[in-house]
A protein has these predicted regions:
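Contiguous, well-ordered beta-strand patches that form the walls/edges
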Residues: 62-99
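Bacterial N-terminal signal peptides
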Residues: 6-16
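Hydrophobic/aromatic beta-strand elements that line small-molecule binding cavities or substrate pockets
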Residues: 58-60, 98-105, 125-128
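A mature extracytoplasmic/lumenal domain signature
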Residues: 34-36, 73, 94, 129
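Short, solvent-exposed loop/hinge segments that bridge or flank secondary-structure elements
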Residues: 26-66
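Sec/Tat signal peptide C-region and signal peptidase I cleavage site
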Residues: 17-21
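Positively charged n-region of N-terminal signal peptides that target proteins for export
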Residues: 1-5
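Short, exposed beta-strand-loop hairpins at the edges of beta-sheets
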Residues: 101-103, 110-124
Length: 130
């Protein structure tokens, strides 16, 4: 009996990622959590830290239906969305910054940048479908 339970648990674990792969195709809203942030100033070194240490949002919501990336204080429209080679590319502008977000359609991993003429923020993290 114990072997059947273990086998069933193993089968569910193996099926999990495949069942969730469709979550990252732009058809469902996502919650993204940047885990590591790098802040770089023009002509200076970069500083790395957690979102709280750097002062960036700890969670973002991507609302594909409303074409917006929603943070704790404001919402930013997605001006361009492109599907290519296993990833979604989202782009927009906000408060004088240009931003881009690349989402791995298989794993939900993300990399995002927010740049202006003085520097750039680079964020790495993961997304899930709530």
């Amino acid at each position: 009996m114990m072997r059947m339970v273990a086998a069933a648990a193993w089968a569910c674990a193996l099926a999990g990622p495949a069942a969730q792969a469709g979550d990252f195709d732009g058809s469902k809203a996502l919650i993204c959590a940047p885990a590591r942030v790098h802040e770089c100033d023009a002509g200076a070194n970069c500083v790395a830290g957690s979102p709280r240490e750097i002062g960036t949002p700890t969670f973002l919501r991507i609302d594909f239906e409303k074409k917006a990336v929603v943070g704790p204080q404001r919402s930013s429209p997605i001006l361009h969305l492109e599907k290519s080679e296993g990833q979604l590319l989202l782009m927009g502008t906000e408060l004088g910054f240009g931003w881009s977000l690349a989402l791995n359609q298989e794993t939900g991993d993300m990399a995002a940048t927010l740049a202006d003429r003085d520097g750039v923020f680079v964020m790495f993290g993961s997304c899930i479908a709530p």
